[in-house]
């Protein structure tokens, strides 16, 4: 018989391996940039201008603001920086209350930083920075100085100082109050305008909230050097049970102490500037039941926000205290980062400014109410949302035993209204960002 042959063994083709390569993160793409002030192959440098010396409020402004900026830069640099460069503070200038313009002109003359951060009480240098095309990121408590200046980016957009708002009236309703007082300083035009705006807001929504204006005084002495006993007596006689002021936190303490002295400790106060945890803690139960509204998501919120977590964690890593001005600095630094990132790896001052001005819903990662920078440099007018926020929102917290807690659900800390109408309505609770 013929020999048989064995069929050759079959072999299995080797498995092919597919390797997926993630595209590089565009944030870290380095491209040469020449002729841009404050930018070299290693860093993007900024100046910080603010008030430290001669601060009449006695509060931490410049240094706390700087804490937030430096924390944000540390956070981003820890990720790898931006376009192959580290973000840095080149130098810090104390404007000593009256020298903001002098410091701005020094920065303009030196021409050695990319942009400027600004936290001051007298913003007379903002116009010079704007007119010289320098990206400026600011603690925007100055509606007039920020208006119509498209190179100035506040932690909030340009506001209408004289317009009515629903925040204080809604807080009056929450407090169950019926007789409202509005107080402000006579020496400060901003304070006087604020005081009138609050009164107008109560008048507008009086029938909706079941409360009315009972006392108005926009001529208080700055810092209440003579106390406030006569005014408190008048308010007591008028049955005032809710007081909104446009005064600083020290004056609020003086007011609260006098109310307690005259047996009016249960009167609810609406504070404009007392989102200051050490100050509130030191006051103990003096401010129990009072309200204050930060202009960003409160630290007390529990919304799972990535940027809020990054802020709190980075501040802790650096050994810095949480503060209102630190968060403002963080938000301003995020705007600067966003401007450059949006401009792309080959950038300059103008392209960064233009890129940020094209953002129609900038919210600093959900920390603030979304801003449309394509239109919100222009001062809004009453009843017209063309240049205003799409939503009117506030995120109040209430004081108790020296601590603070959100009024809304901590997961949705903002109360918001449709801003296309002035009609009264119950607000919706919401959260922004992620």
Please give the residue ranges for each predicted region:
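Extracellular mucin-like PTS domains
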Residues: 1-23
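Extracytoplasmic "Venus flytrap"
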Residues: 28-70, 92-98, 185-194, 322-327
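Short glycine/serine- and small hydrophobic-enriched flexible loop segments
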Residues: 51, 74, 334-342
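Periplasmic-binding protein-like
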Residues: 108-120, 137-139, 179-184, 238-249, ...
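Beta-alpha junction/loop-to-helix N-cap segments that form part of ligand/metal-binding clefts
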Residues: 32, 60-70, 78-149, 217-229, ...
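Extracellular/periplasmic Venus flytrap/periplasmic-binding protein
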Residues: 150-263, 301-302, 306
């Amino acid at each position: 018989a013929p020999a048989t042959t064995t069929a050759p063994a079959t072999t299995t083709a080797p498995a092919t391996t597919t390797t997926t390569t993630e595209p590089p993160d565009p944030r870290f793409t380095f491209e040469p940039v020449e002729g841009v002030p404050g930018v070299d192959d290693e860093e993007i440098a900024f100046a910080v201008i603010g008030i430290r010396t001669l601060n009449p409020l006695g509060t931490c402004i410049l240094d706390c603001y700087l804490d937030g900026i430096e924390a944000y830069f540390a956070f981003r640099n820890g990720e790898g920086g931006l376009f192959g460069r580290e973000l840095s503070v080149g130098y810090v200038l104390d404007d000593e209350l009256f020298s903001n313009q002098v410091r701005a002109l020094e920065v303009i003359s030196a021409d050695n930083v990319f942009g400027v951060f600004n936290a001051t009480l007298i913003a007379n240098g903002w116009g010079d920075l704007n007119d010289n095309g320098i990206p400026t990121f600011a603690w925007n408590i100055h509606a007039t100085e920020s208006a119509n200046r498209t190179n100035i980016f506040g932690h909030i957009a340009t506001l209408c100082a004289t317009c009515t708002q629903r925040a204080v009236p809604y807080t009056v309703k929450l407090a169950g109050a019926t007789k409202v007082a509005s107080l402000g300083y006579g020496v400060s035009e901003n304070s006087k305008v604020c005081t009138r705006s609050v009164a107008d807001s109560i008048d507008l929504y009086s029938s909706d909230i079941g409360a009315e204006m009972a006392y108005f005084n926009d001529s208080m002495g700055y810092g209440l050097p003579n106390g406030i006993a006569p005014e408190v007596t008048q308010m007591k006689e008028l049955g005032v049970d809710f007081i909104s002021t446009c005064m600083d936190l020290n004056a609020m303490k003086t007011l609260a102490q006098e109310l307690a002295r005259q047996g009016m400790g249960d009167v609810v106060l609406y504070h404009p500037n007392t989102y200051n945890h050490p100050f509130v803690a030191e006051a103990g139960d003096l401010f129990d039941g009072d309200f204050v509204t930060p202009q960003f998501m409160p630290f007390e919120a529990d919304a799972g926000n990535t940027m809020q977590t990054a802020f709190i964690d980075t501040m802790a890593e650096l050994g810095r205290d949480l503060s209102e001005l630190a968060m403002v600095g963080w938000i301003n630094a995020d705007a600067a980062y966003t401007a450059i990132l949006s401009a792309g790896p080959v950038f300059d001052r103008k392209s960064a400014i233009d890129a940020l001005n094209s953002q129609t819903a900038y919210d600093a990662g959900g920390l603030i109410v979304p801003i449309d920078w394509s239109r919100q440099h222009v001062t809004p007018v009453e009843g017209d949302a063309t240049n205003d926020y799409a939503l009117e929102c506030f995120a109040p917290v209430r004081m108790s035993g020296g601590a603070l807690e959100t009024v809304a659900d901590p997961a949705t800390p903002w109360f918001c209204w449709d801003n296309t109408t002035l009609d009264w309505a119950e607000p919706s609770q919401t959260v922004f960002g992620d």
